[in-house]
C-alpha cells in the first residue's frame, strides 16, 4: 500500500483539529477535571473537586459533579464533613455513598452505620438520618433520581 505524505499530513491535521475543538476532552468549566466522551461516558478526577460550603452548616461542604443535561437520571457529587461535623437530612431519593477518605457515619433511629475508605453505604428513599464523622470524611454520592429536588 502506497500512502502519500500529503494524505497522512491531512489526516493528522484533521485529527488534531478535532481533538482541540472537542470540549469533551478538555477540563469542564467546573473548577475540576471532567472529561466527557461523545457517547455520554464521562470521567471526573475526584481529587480535583473542591467542595463549597453547604447550607450554612459548619464543617459541611459539597460539589455536584454532573449536570441534569449530562446525566438526566442519576446525580453525583462529592461531599466533605470536617472534624466532627454532622447534619440532619431526610432523603426523598435513593443514595449511595462511597467513602474516599476518613470515616462517614450514617446515624438512623439511634443506630450508626460507619464506613471508611473504599466502603459503600446505601441509604434508601424516605430515610431520616444524620450524616456525621468522628474525624473527617470525603465521599462521593450518587442519587436517583437526579432531579431529587423536584420529588417533594
Region roles according to the model:
Residues 1-7, 21-22:
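Intrinsically disordered, low-complexity regulatory segments in eukaryotic proteins
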Residues 12-75:
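A short, N-terminal "cap"/entry segment at the start of jelly-roll beta-barrel domains
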Residues 59-91, 125, 147:
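Conserved short histidine dyad/triad with adjacent acidic residue
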Residues 78, 91, 108-110, 133, ...:
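Residue-level recognition of conserved beta-strand positions in structured domain cores
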Residues 81, 90-106:
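Short, conserved beta-strand element in jelly-roll/cupin
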Residues 112, 147-152:
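Alpha-helical scaffolds that organize eukaryotic protein assemblies
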Residues 125-149:
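Ligand-binding loop in jelly-roll beta-barrel domains
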Amino acid at each position: 500500500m502506497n500512502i502519500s505524505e500529503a494524505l497522512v499530513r491531512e489526516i493528522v491535521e484533521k485529527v488534531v483539529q478535532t481533538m482541540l475543538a472537542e470540549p469533551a476532552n478538555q477540563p469542564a468549566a467546573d473548577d475540576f477535571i471532567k472529561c466527557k466522551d461523545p457517547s455520554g461516558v464521562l470521567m471526573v478526577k475526584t481529587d480535583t473537586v473542591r467542595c463549597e460550603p453547604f447550607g450554612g452548616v459548619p464543617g459541611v461542604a459539597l460539589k455536584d459533579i454532573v449536570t441534569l443535561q449530562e446525566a438526566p437520571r442519576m446525580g453525583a457529587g462529592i461531599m466533605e464533613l470536617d472534624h466532627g461535623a454532622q447534619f440532619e437530612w431526610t432523603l426523598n431519593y435513593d443514595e449511595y455513598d462511597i467513602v474516599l477518605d476518613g470515616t462517614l457515619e450514617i446515624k438512623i433511629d439511634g443506630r450508626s452505620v460507619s464506613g471508611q475508605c473504599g466502603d459503600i453505604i446505601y441509604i434508601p428513599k424516605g430515610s431520616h438520618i444524620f450524616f456525621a464523622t468522628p474525624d473527617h470524611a470525603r465521599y462521593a454520592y450518587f442519587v436517583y433520581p437526579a432531579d431529587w429536588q423536584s420529588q417533594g
